UniProtKB/Swiss-Prot annotation:
One of its GO terms (biological process) is protein insertion into membrane. It comes from the Bacteria. It is found in: Cell membrane. This is Membrane protein insertase YidC 2. Residues 1-23 form the signal peptide. InterPro entries: YidC/ALB3/OXA1/COX18, YidC/Oxa/ALB_C, YidC/YidC1/YidC2_Firmicutes, YidC_ALB_C. Keywords: Cell membrane, Chaperone, Lipoprotein, Membrane, Palmitate, Protein transport, Signal, Transmembrane, Transmembrane helix, Transport. The chain crosses the membrane at residues 33-53, 58-78, 135-155, 180-200, 219-239. It comes from Streptococcus agalactiae serotype V (strain ATCC BAA-611 / 2603 V/R).
Amino acid sequence: MKKTLKRILFSSLSLSMLLLLTGCVSVDKAGKPYGVIWNTLGVPMANLITYFAQHQGLGFGVAIIIVTVIVRVVILPLGLYQSWKASYQAEKMAYFKPLFEPINERLRNAKTQEEKLAAQTELMTAQRENGLSMFGGIGCLPLLIQMPFFSAIFFAARYTPGVSSATFLGLNLGQKSLTLTVIIAILYFVQSWLSMQGVPDEQRQQMKTMMYLMPIMMVFMSISLPASVALYWFIGGIFSIIQQLVTTYVLKPKLRRKVEEEYTKNPPKAYKANNARKDVTNSTKATESNQAIITSKKTNRNAGKQKRRG
């Protein structure tokens, strides 16, 4: 539930920041954008689009694709770093789940507000002592750096002179495109589906809402904007899938091994409650869970070795 809340908060934060940065670029009565983000990043991007479209004779559709690819390649390391931080924190939380289970059980079974508050405090203390944080993997700085680029290319794709009257593969870039909207929805659904791979079944059930939320959001935005913007989101969706593939099948396995090695060398300590109503049984369970983590990881590694030999 906490990871679901974290993802919802992260998505809400991303959307809020997108709207905030969109507000930084205003459009005057003549239909010309202005503002700090536009003057700093948007104008150079618009000039690049014009250069590829008119001076190189590639057309505005291809020009938008090229500039979008350039921008996404530039900020891809930031996106991967953000994914690395979030995945590292998630793997650590998964590793510590058996250790925190007795506390979570007390939290679920709490009958009074006092008991619930005590369990929550104990859980947060245990997480803090082991270097864990519910929001530690969000990484706001990389997102803050990326958002101006997203905002600038959004307006460059929409307001570069000549784009609204251009066509690309039979699509009028100045009008809405149902075809691109459907493709974008599929791309972002695939990206959301990939993010659920390798996730425990229990957590996967909690993430189902998020799997549909992003495609729905993209449909509503794409269907109300010109095809030039949808074309930018189409390329962005491809890059999102690439980033998610790297995260799911490259970063996560490496981080899982890294976490296992870290806590094999330095086994995590069981948290001891300091309150007066200390439950000896739960303390024993925590200690047993602490040992169970190491035993479970060793068993999984031995099983993997036997499979490879077979």
